[in-house]
Amino acid sequence: MNRFLTLLFIFFAICTDISAQEAEMEQHLFDTMRDGDKAAVVAIHIGAEDADAKQNIEKFNAMLRKAYPTIDFREAWTSRILIQQVHSNGGGNIPTTDELFSQLNKDGYTHLLIQSSNIVNSTDMQILRYEVDAAKETFKQIRLGEPLLTDETDYEEVLKATAAAYGSEKEANVLMCEGTHGSENAQYALLDYILKVQDYKSWFVATSGGYPSLSSLVKQLKKQKVKKVHLIPFLFTAGSKATSAIAHEWAQQLQRAGYKVTTELHNLSDVDAIIDIFENHLRHAEMFHRYSPKELKMMTR
């Protein structure tokens, strides 16, 4: 990346409160274990609303199990609505993060290594950080891996992998993202900027309910005199139901604007290189202890 883009990334990192900026020291998690200690690897997801979404989640979970085959595996969801749907359909009881932490503590676990399937440092991710920091009083060691898009290299590798897997040379490629009115929109705006700086011709980013918006996308398409658009779900845990609903709505609006639209049927969970980035973040969390704001404050007293 050029110097300007690096400075821009730092600015976005500050605005979105990306905790990768915190101090850390090398300390392998499992090397800190003593006789009688118990460890678990934990996957955190928003949840799954259909069978396809469950398969996407399982690909992520399989990565964690394969990375640490001798360590107990556990899973929690953050959406109580999706948890209730599964329970109502006879799919068993899936704990929330707090419920899982409480149960692991009761079961004698002392060391937790956690990775979520969040794409950006969203509100959900920030809540998870708070829950993990609060649980540090309960466990001897608890580590949390970063979301998919965290540092400069992540953005470059994710775009490279997505383009290789789903890019179309004959159409304008549009990454469909789940934006909100929160700070995570800044990360999608940065993603869009990096596409342009890295010379990804005819590639665009748009979000549902956030920025860059679909209306801003149409303005860009008109400037480049685009006629055909290829929609690519920049999603991970979403199943076919949710993906189809978003794609259908976008396709209708783009068609009304005069564009021919095709839609990619797969998402990021089907790209091995994306799964590898999540694993890299998990292994980094295992190898490095990151000081929380509370720990840093105590160290400076």
Q: Language-model segments: what does each one mean?
A:
Residues 16-20:
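Sec/Tat signal peptide C-region and signal peptidase I cleavage site
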Residues 4-14:
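Sec-dependent N-terminal signal peptides
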